[in-house]
C-alpha cells in the first residue's frame, strides 16, 4: 500500500 517502502508490496 501507500506507506510501504516499495510501492505495491502493501
From Swiss-Prot:
Disulfide bonds: none
One GO cellular component, as annotated: membrane
Subcellular location: Secreted; Target cell membrane
Domain of life of the native organism: Eukaryota
Keywords: Ion transport, Membrane, Secreted, Target cell membrane, Target membrane, Toxin, Transmembrane, Transport
Molecular function terms, GO-annotated: toxin activity
GO aspect biological process, one term: monoatomic ion transport
The keyword Signal is annotated on this UniProt entry: no
Membrane spanning stretches: none
Coiled coil (residue ranges): none
Family of the protein in this entry: Belongs to the pardaxin family.
Subunit: Monomer. In aqueous solution exists as a tetramer.
Function description: Exhibits unusual shark repellent and surfactant properties. Forms voltage-dependent, ion-permeable channels in membranes. At high concentration causes cell membrane lysis. Shown to be 5-10 times more toxic, cytolytic and active in membrane pore formation than pardaxin-2.
Name recorded for this polypeptide: Pardaxin-1
Natural source organism: Pardachirus marmoratus
Amino acid at each position: 500500500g501507500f506507506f510501504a517502502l516499495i510501492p505495491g508490496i502493501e
